[in-house]
Amino acid sequence: MPYAHGGDADLYYEIHGAGTPILLSAGMGGGAGFWRPQIEALAARHQVILYDHAGTGRSGRDIGPRSITEMARDMARVLDAAGVEDAHVAGHAIGGIIGMELALAAPERVRSLTIVNGWARADGFLRRCFEVRKRILLASGPEAYVRAQPLFLYPPRWIAENIAVLEEEEAQMVAHFPGTQTMLNRIETFLAFDGRERLADIRVPTLLAAAKDDALVPSYLSTLLAEGIPDARIAEVDWGAHAFSAVTPDVFNEMLLGFCGEIDQ
């Protein structure tokens, strides 16, 4: 298994396909597996790079609190290890924030930026959601935290129709949970992030992808991002909730491939 070395945590990564590189960065869970519904479609046209965030999955676990700046450096290390100078960067929620930080720190490495259900700063609603998740984790433990997660991520009908799939995923997530303190550290880092004053400094082509029925990160937060980032565009779907890339992968894949294709022309 390939790893990016050189920092305080070895970072597991995967490469699929060939072509102009696309680096995918997951959200709160941090695992490369979040992007499984994207691999086949994207790898037919691009070199697809996935990785586990530091402290999660198969990456090094022995880390303390990690800033967004450090997470962006991790992202750059993965590109270095893969031998990639620049890539389209797509991040889900927190992964998008990390991509935004890389676009600010090293714009020459980001061909384009796609932020899926992201935000510039956690507002009162989003903070309440994260605080509830923290309390579930602290009061009831990792299993309850994991079992509550679909309620934040997926549409009710999709949950009802995919109970067996969710139960299988939950068993894996509990077995490989990053640890309570690591997850709490990640939540605190994301709540502390405030990128509002630097949005105008983002100079790479940017797409804000959002789901109108996202009950965790409302789509108006993507609208605010689009208003602050020069020449950014927003693409919204009606249904799919926070994890619409998994719920309606064909829709998301077409959206991302179309955007990257325009940039590569």
Curated annotation (Swiss-Prot):
It catalyses: carbamate + 2 H(+) = NH4(+) + CO2. Belongs to the AB hydrolase superfamily. Hydrolase RutD family. Its EC number is 3.5.1.-. It comes from Azorhizobium caulinodans (strain ATCC 43989 / DSM 5975 / JCM 20966 / LMG 6465 / NBRC 14845 / NCIMB 13405 / ORS 571). The keyword Iron-sulfur does not apply. This is Putative carbamate hydrolase RutD. Keywords: Hydrolase. Residues 21-123 form the AB hydrolase-1 domain. It comes from the Bacteria. InterPro entries: AB_hydrolase, AB_hydrolase_1, AB_hydrolase_fold, Pyrimidine_utilisation_RutD. Involved in pyrimidine catabolism. May facilitate the hydrolysis of carbamate, a reaction that can also occur spontaneously. GO terms for biological process: nitrogen utilization; uracil catabolic process. The keyword Hydrolase applies. It is an enzyme of class 3 (hydrolase). GO terms for molecular function: hydrolase activity, acting on carbon-nitrogen (but not peptide) bonds, in linear amides.
